[in-house]
Amino acid sequence: MKSLDLPWIINILSTLSFSNLPHGIIISGPDGIGKKILANAISSRLLINKTTNIENSDLVNSNSHPDYFYLNNEKVLLHNITFRKNKWDDEKGQRNVNDFLSKTPSISINKVAVIVNAQTMNDESQNALLKSLEEPSPNSYIIMITNRPKCLLNTIYSRCQVINIPSLKIDDLNKWLINNGVSDVNALDFPSFTSPLKILEELENNQHLNFKQFIKIITEFIFNNSDTNSTIKNIISLDIDLIMKINYLIEFLKIILKSRLLSEDLSGVFKDFNSSNFNNLKISNLMNELNALRYDYFKVPQINETHILNYFLSELKNSIKI
């Protein structure tokens, strides 16, 4: 997908001063909002051919540009950032960000390294990257992509320009969906944190009903139509990871709490909760617990899903009365 399909990306690009960009850039935003597309567009602008003075976008898009290093690993490790002898392969070598940026550009004015999933770098990897940020080689740029705010060291943030891509408003998201040929779903059918490209991905993979199904499972449990074991089994069977299930549960609590605070009636899959009783503070505290769990999960992902679900289902039943 081209950046022209995403007007909010075009707006961000139009605000950037490419003649005065810092050596470090952090692009932050939810999954599916266009962070990679923005990084690609910025990289193309920076990688002007020093002979023809035009962009080599095709080389960037195909990840075959000699002055472009696109690191797209699920987890960014130390040897991806700096040379580690024990990770060296005599035949293949070991490409890393710091060594790449230290070399003179081949065909472009600049060199650009893009680090996807930068939030997965541990402190040692980030400190190794600081070398290229504190003492950058001439005409070198590092673009880091993260899906969480404030997930890197303060020393990293202090040396970078941060570009936050916010979620779209419901009306803007629906308009974008229609313009892209999607008229049979509404943005309100998805959690508020779901982004445009994520909706398209869920539609393509037939996962667009996951949130509604999750709410139905929770509703059945709270209204005593399903016991704890059956509910846990049904939640685990959903084709989403534990973090997304936590996000869904937080979204559910946000929606019912907001309706109470604003005296608004709920509709759709939430309408049964118009007659429910709950303490606002209890719901707020439960959301705080879930947010804390989500934070801990990123540090220690080996969390027992069944135990987690059992605890929070019990808290839900104690907090929401029918």
Task: Annotate the PLM regions.
Residues 68-70, 162:
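Conserved beta-strand scaffold positions in the cores of enzyme catalytic domains, especially
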Residues 27, 115, 129-130, 146:
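Hydrophobic residues in beta-strands of the RecA-like P-loop NTPase core, especially within AAA+ ATPase
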